[in-house]
A protein has these predicted regions:
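Helical scaffold of the NTase/Pol beta-like nucleotidyltransferase catalytic core
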Residues: 1-19
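Short secondary-structure junctions
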Residues: 14-23, 66-70
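Short edge beta-strands and adjacent turn/loop segments
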Residues: 20-37
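Short, flexible beta-strand-to-coil junctions
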Residues: 28-32, 44-45, 80, 125-127
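A short interface-forming secondary-structure element
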Residues: 40-53
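Short, non-transmembrane amphipathic alpha-helical segments
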Residues: 50-69
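Catalytic "initiation/cleavage/transfer" segments centered on a nucleophilic residue
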Residues: 70-128
Length: 128
């Protein structure tokens, strides 16, 4: 997973240089039967109701990840900056350029009401 996390850091850096900062960029590993990762993203320049936002993220993922790595991820979840989930993740930990924080799923499972085995927070940065 470490190699994939490094690739996600590259993806984040590339997208931020072209579009602006992310508020939140996280990976949640769902429990069986899925055993796949959800990509949780929030940025002021992304719109959860516009297909073009999803296409932009998906294209960058496909550009950087191998086909096998890409199949580990089941969906992209774009959240509005004022969403309560974004506020929760921003308050959980600050994660800046090049860092990440791993979380066990227990606390997140209780908060979000679905089973999360593991989570990585790759960006959590409040706007000034």
């Amino acid at each position: 997973m470490k190699e994939v996390l490094e690739k996600f850091k590259t993806i984040i850096k590339s997208l931020e240089s072209g579009h602006g900062s992310f508020l939140v960029f996280a990976l949640f590993l769902r429990e069986k039967p899925f055993e796949t990762w959800d990509i949780i993203i929030s940025a002021t320049w992304l719109n959860s109701s516009e297909l073009s936002s999803y296409k932009l993220i998906s294209a960058k993922l496909q550009e950087v990840l191998t086909g096998q790595e890409f199949l580990q991820f089941s969906r992209i979840v774009l959240l509005d900056p004022d969403d309560q989930t974004v506020k929760f993740l921003l308050d959980l930990e600050t994660v800046k350029n090049g860092g990440y924080k791993e979380f066990s799923g227990e606390a997140l499972t209780e908060k979000f009401k679905f089973t999360i085995k593991r989570a990585y927070l790759l960006r959590s940065l409040k706007q000034p």
